[in-house]
């Protein structure tokens, strides 16, 4: 009987394919991909919804977007009277159409919607929620995922992504909607009157906040190459740099045009060195010093340097974090009670740098919403000077409550310009940090373990560390094991257990005098990540051996 119902559901979806907005994507998919759309179901989690286009409840299409929007409308109306919301969207396939669908559904429920007539960045959405004092915000993006993906991120009234509790409540409202094929969305002129143009003044205010943060960029002969990887950071980043009287940059023209197919990049992820390929070519032609890329929704950023011989130095997320923290420490020397926030899988390097400079630091779970929660809880006398995650997400000043590559681009250019005046580079600055606090190094191993056997292996690895914690790993003596699922930390040398004041998450962190390793399974994919952050000789060899020991 279940198989018959599934077949009937599939037939109903195929009958509605012409109205789904995604027929073209569905027809290009393999049989397995098509079937997965009918046999799976999109779920609204702490990061919203993200998935492929296609037919069925397991795919993004007109009907699943209407279901999401209807659930969110009921959620918002239950939370506040006369709610308002701002919607932004990126350059991906169907982002504009999904934005209009969501706006129509919300308007149908007497929710005032601010909707721009062009694409915007994710940090602009966070800022707009705060600037317009709306009850919520919606960002339509799939960040750096492949071209056949999109997603919906939901933000609360503070401009941060929804908390875990709020996400769970919104999810219940969405699930209560039921079958997306049975939704009827009447549209009338009265309802569409709730949809308002997005005020240009908000973008102007956002630019002013960044201009005030930067002040000025010193005159030097620094040359920059910038690529938006076909995303949303053009035109806002070039306009911002010009407003700061910095014009010594060249755009990778082929990649600075919005393109939902990401035609000229192998990867639209600034973590991936391949994302810089065309930027490197242009840097060599233009004798540029600094290369900067932002991901498609402009919340994350990567950098590289080109020396006089054309040699490229790529910086990982932890190294960029250390450079930016170092610069912010220099900029804020007059402030007392300075604070830096980072995720629990980010580097020991930045913590050592903070300690050396008498800057307090806090560690939070992975996910920038946890950083935003810390910012919200700051005392009046505390000054948050920097926050970051090792996955290339940075925030300098909290007028935005999410990762913000747009505010970081001029900040890193200003730092590089100052260094250039003294004949120094960012690589030199990083080396100076190492000389000051020690050469803490970091790497990440990501393992995909498919199927039931893969799931069993991931569970076995986590269980082993929980039930039989090692005394040492590759000659490194274990001091403590932090288990964020049980919210406990076990001190091996003292044989004591204490509580961790943190939300629960399936993460284990093993602490040594030399640093830490962390294990973090994905909640949505058959993946597990191993983070290694150590100050030790032969780091690369030690990291490889730790990885082999755990996953052999």
Swiss-Prot record:
The protein's GO terms of the molecular function aspect are: magnesium ion binding; phosphoglucomutase activity; phosphopentomutase activity
Q: Name one GO biological process term.
A: enterobacterial common antigen biosynthetic process
- EC number from the UniProt entry: 5.4.2.2
Co-factor binding comment: Binds 1 Mg(2+) ion per subunit.
Q: Give, as in the UniProt entry, the pathway in which the protein acts.
A: Glycolipid metabolism; diglucosyl-diacylglycerol biosynthesis
Q: Where does Mg(2+) bind?
A: 143, 295, 297, 299
InterPro entries (alphabetical): A-D-PHexomutase_a/b/a-I (IPR005844), A-D-PHexomutase_a/b/a-I/II/III (IPR016055), A-D-PHexomutase_a/b/a-II (IPR005845), A-D-PHexomutase_a/b/a-III (IPR005846), A-D-PHexomutase_C (IPR005843), A-D-PHexomutase_C_sf (IPR036900), A-D-PHexomutase_CS (IPR016066), Alpha-D-phosphohexomutase_SF (IPR005841)
Q: Into which EC class is this enzyme placed?
A: isomerase
Q: What protein family does this chain belong to? A: Belongs to the phosphohexose mutase family.
Specify the protein name. Answer: Phosphoglucomutase
Name what cofactor the protein needs.
Answer: Mg(2+)
What Pfam families does this protein's entry cite?
PGM_PMM_I, PGM_PMM_II, PGM_PMM_III, PGM_PMM_IV
Q: What is the catalytic activity of this protein?
A: alpha-D-glucose 1-phosphate = alpha-D-glucose 6-phosphate
What keywords are annotated for this sequence in UniProt? Carbohydrate metabolism, Glucose metabolism, Isomerase, Magnesium, Metal-binding, Phosphoprotein
């Amino acid at each position: 009987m279940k198989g018959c119902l599934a077949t009937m559901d599939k037939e109903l979806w195929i009958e509605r394919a012409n109205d789904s907005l995604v027929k073209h994507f569905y027809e290009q998919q393999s049989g397995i991909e098509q079937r997965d759309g009918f046999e799976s179901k999109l779920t609204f989690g702490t990061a919203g919804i993200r998935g492929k286009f296609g037919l069925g409840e397991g795919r993004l299409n007109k009907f699943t977007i209407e279901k999401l929007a209807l659930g969110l409308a009921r959620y918002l109306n239950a939370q506040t009277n006369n709610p308002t919301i701002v919607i932004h969207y990126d350059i991906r396939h169907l982002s504009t159409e999904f934005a209009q669908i969501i706006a129509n559904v919300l308007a149908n429920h007497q929710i005032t919607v601010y909707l721009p007539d062009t694409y915007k960045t994710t940090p602009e959405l966070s800022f707009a929620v705060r600037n317009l004092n709306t009850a919520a915000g919606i960002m339509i993006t799939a960040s750096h995922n492949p071209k056949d993906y999109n997603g919906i991120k939901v933000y609360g009234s503070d401009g941060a992504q929804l908390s875990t509790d709020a996400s769970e409540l919104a999810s219940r409202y969405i699930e209560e909607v039921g079958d997306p094929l049975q939704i009827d969305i009447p549209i009338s002129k009265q309802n569409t009157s709730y949809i308002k143009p997005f005020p240009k003044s908000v973008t102007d205010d956002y630019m002013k906040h960044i201009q005030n943060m930067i002040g000025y960029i010193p005159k030097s002969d620094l040359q920059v190459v910038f690529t938006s990887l076909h995303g949303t950071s053009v035109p806002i980043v070039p306009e911002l740099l010009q407003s700061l009287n910095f014009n010594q940059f060249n755009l990778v023209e082929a990649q600075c045009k919005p393109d939902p197919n990401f035609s000229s990049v192998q990867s639209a992820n600034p973590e991936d060195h391949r994302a810089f390929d065309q930027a490197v070519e242009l840097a060599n032609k233009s004798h540029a010093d600094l290369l900067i890329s932002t991901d498609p929704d402009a919340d994350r950023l990567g950098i590289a340097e080109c020396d006089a011989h054309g040699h490229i130095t790529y910086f990982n997320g932890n190294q960029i974090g250390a450079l930016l923290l170092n610069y912010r420490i220099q900029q804020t020397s007059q402030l007392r009670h300075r604070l830096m926030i980072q995720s629990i899988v980010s580097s020991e390097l930045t913590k050592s740098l903070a300690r050396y400079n008498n800057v307090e630091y806090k560690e939070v779970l992975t996910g920038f919403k946890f950083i935003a929660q810390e910012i919200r809880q700051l005392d009046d006398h505390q000054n948050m000077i920097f926050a970051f995650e090792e996955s290339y997400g940075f925030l300098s000043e909290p007028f935005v409550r999410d990762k913000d590559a747009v505010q970081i681009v001029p900040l890193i250019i200003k730092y590089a310009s100052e260094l250039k005046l003294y004949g120094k580079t960012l690589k030199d600055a990083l080396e100076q940090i190492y000389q000051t606090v020690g050469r803490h190094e970091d790497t990440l191993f990501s393992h995909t373990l498919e199927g039931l056997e893969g799931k069993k292996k991931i569970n076995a690895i986590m269980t082993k560390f929980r039930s039989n914690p090692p005394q040492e790993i590759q000659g490194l003596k274990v001091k403590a094991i932090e288990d964020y699922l049980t919210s406990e930390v076990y001190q091996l040398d003292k044989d004591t257990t204490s509580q961790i004041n943190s939300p629960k998450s399936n993460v284990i962190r093993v602490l040594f005098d030399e640093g830490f390793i962390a294990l973090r399974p994905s909640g949505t994919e058959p993946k597990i990540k191993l983070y290694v952050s150590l100050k030790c000789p032969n780091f690369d060899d030690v990291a490889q051996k730790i990885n082999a020991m755990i996953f052999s």
